[in-house]
Amino acid sequence: MLGFEPFFMELIGGIEESLAAEGRSLLLHVVPDHDAEIRTYRRWGEGKLVDAVVVVNIALEDARLEVLGELGIPTVIVGGPSPNLPFANVWIDNAQAMRTAVTHLVGLGHRRLARVSGPRHLAHTQARTDAFMGECARLGAHGAVVEGDYGEESGTRATRALLGRGSPPSAIIYDNDVMAVAGLGVAHEMDVAVPERLSLLAWDDSALCRLSHPALSAMSLDVHAMGVQVADCVLNLLASGTVRSYTAPLPRLVARGTTTTAPTADG
């Protein structure tokens, strides 16, 4: 089950490119929820219709993994909660990347930080939130979290709520590019100057970030290359049957036009 963000389009492109080079095809099947996804896996497994599956957006309690283990379909997990999974996986250290983001903003003088997260039931959301709150506490900053769903509307709603507080944040980290662009629009509507009064940082770098005005600072990951890495993980699993963990490069912070030193009142 995939999201609609540019992240997934880039990931799919990388997977497909690498598989095609080995004469294999990528099958995409759109489903509305995990229950429908599980039914699809059962049909694929019972009919031996696929050689392997790639699973994304791992939940804290994820019934899909138990079913895939039961069916015995070779499985690759993308972005799981840790590298210590009983499945082949491509792992991202979301906690360390979040600590890097918070440290950067606090280094700019920000003491009131907020995070607009993805859905809280996702494992990577929890990892980022825990790291965000932990690093804020360690550095003596105040951290607040508002849950979103990766969509434009939730980014708009969350940003309005945060900026409407009596002591609004001077910096906001968004869990994806779509919500960050929506937040930038809200700041313009509310006459909150970016970055002079409010710094914004997107988690997934994309053309949306680069083309916004001002261009959004972002945590940048080469998602296409990660897709190639996922495909290589699939091919190695099929060739050897060995379950291995692969670590993706850490996202790097790209400072553009939406982050700067904190307003004097926040310092």
Spell out what each predicted region is.
Residues 1-103:
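Alpha-helical recognition/docking segments in bacterial nutrient-uptake
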Residues 50-56, 114-116, 146, 166-176, ...:
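Periplasmic-binding protein-like
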